[in-house]
């Protein structure tokens, strides 16, 4: 599975972003924390498609769970 969240020092100073975009992954988390829906996020950031957003959430979940073990 290709990484959906990438870090590149040439893109936003290495901030984790959605692959192929300049949209920081943390923006999605902030939307969800604030009570917004995935659809609201996607409307504001059309360069991120639904499949990419869901895959990134899954990737982050797997990473977090593995760190907790």
What are these regions (language model features)?
Residues 25-27, 32-69:
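Long, charge-rich, low-complexity alpha-helical segments
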């Amino acid at each position: 599975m290709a990484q959906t969240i990438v870090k590149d020092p040439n893109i936003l100073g290495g901030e984790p972003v959605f692959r192929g975009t300049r949209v920081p992954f943390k923006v999605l988390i902030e939307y969800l924390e604030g009570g917004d829906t995935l659809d609201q996020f996607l409307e504001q950031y059309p360069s991120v498609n639904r499949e990419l957003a869901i895959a990134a959430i899954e990737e982050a979940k797997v990473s977090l769970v593995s760190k907790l073990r």
